[in-house]
Amino acid sequence: MRILCSAGLALMLLAPAWAGVQVGGPAPDFTLPDENGTRHKLSQYRGRIVVLEWTNPQCPFVQEHYQNKTMIRLYERYRSQDVVWLAVNSSHFNKPADTRRWAQENGIPYPTLQDPEGTVGRLYGAQTTPHMFVIDRNGTLVYRGAIDNAYDPDRDQAGPVNYVEQVLDALLRGERPPVRETKPYGCTVKYKPSATS
């Protein structure tokens, strides 16, 4: 994956340091509508593995991942194995119509939940787009962080390691995920400014 821009990487370093939910703890329940108005309650997926992907179509990192079909390929691989994939857009300026257009243009087969107030994003401590969270069948958060190590300057592999893929494979084998938390990279989540800012 090519380096997009130094400004984009700088945005990652300026991400707010919300604590959010802790790995190993219960994933907080929430209800959000998707781009078509269908409401999704996290607890309705209890008994299944859930992937939450914070996204923003205007972010160059997100755009590159969708050009490369990173997320869509993972969804296609695991959807028949009782894995639920939910994108979440916490950008304050996002409109459902924008999401529908983005989904149609990119062939996105899973819903994008609309969180313009940033309530759920802040609850989970989502800092970047993308920022990935994996929840096991018992409702426990087992991973949060980057989709892969493409921007890790210390990696020595020929290609990037996909952390979400590693976590899902381990969960489906009934094993403990080999990685629990990594530093996310991408654009900062464009939260609605607070009244005091």
Spans of features found by a protein language model:
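Bacterial N-terminal signal peptides
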Residues: S6-P16
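Thiol-/selenol-based redox modules, centered on thioredoxin-like
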Residues: D136-R137, L141-S197
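Structural microenvironment flanking redox-active thiols in thiol-disulfide oxidoreductases
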Residues: Q63-N106, Q114-L123
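Boundary at the C-terminal end of the N-terminal hydrophobic targeting segment
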Residues: A17-V21
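Short active-site neighborhood of thiol/selenol oxidoreductases, capturing the structured segment around
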Residues: S43-E64, W85, L168
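Short, internal strand/loop/helix patches
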Residues: W102-R144
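A short beta-strand-turn-helix
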Residues: F30-V50
